[in-house]
Amino acid sequence: GETGEFSSLLEKIGIPQTSCSSDICKLTFDKHEYVKFINSLNLKTAKQFFIKKGQEYNVSDIAEKVGIPCFVKPNKSGSSFGISKVKNKDLLNDKINYAFQEGDEVLVESFLDGKEVSVGVINIDGQRTILPITEIRSKNEFFDFDAKYNGESDENKAEVERIGTG
């Protein structure tokens, strides 16, 4: 799905979907390359430190660059597998190793405080429909696998609509 393979299949057989096109999925699955692309458009992103498996790194340098708290995540993984929120520099190395269990590249990104929202858009027969904005409220520390797939989050449409019209 997130690699673009499932989206590509749906596109080929003409089934509408609310996920990104297969090309966009492929672009965004490599988080490091996607952030470089976004930065090339002069858009702001979280501060980032990229590590390849086997590369030497210094946790103090990483913490200084991105700050604490921060997120450690596999570069090419979906569904929040391998992601950790790190609130103590002493845990950074362990969480980097945890993320490496999902792949050969890891990103450490600065924590951005705020609300998380989702907006679906669907095109059917050339007609674009924008679905309602929803705020994601995780019962966990962040929007992790359990929050996404095991019901440990709430989507709050009414609150987002109130904020948007207020």
What are these regions (language model features)?
Residues 1-29, 44-47:
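A short, GP-enriched loop/loop-strand-helix hinge that lies immediately N-terminal to
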Residues 2-6, 81-82, 118:
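Short glycine-/acidic-enriched loop or helix-start segments at secondary-structure transitions
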Residues 5-9, 66-68, 149-151:
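Short hydrophobic/aromatic-rich motifs at helix boundaries and adjacent loops
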Residues 18-20, 79-80, 157-158:
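Short small-residue beta-strand/loop micro-motif enriched in glycine and branched aliphatics
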Residues 27-115, 126:
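Active-site nucleotide/adenylate-binding loops and adjacent lid/helix of ATP-dependent enzymes
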Residues 87-165:
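Phosphate-binding site of ATP-dependent enzymes
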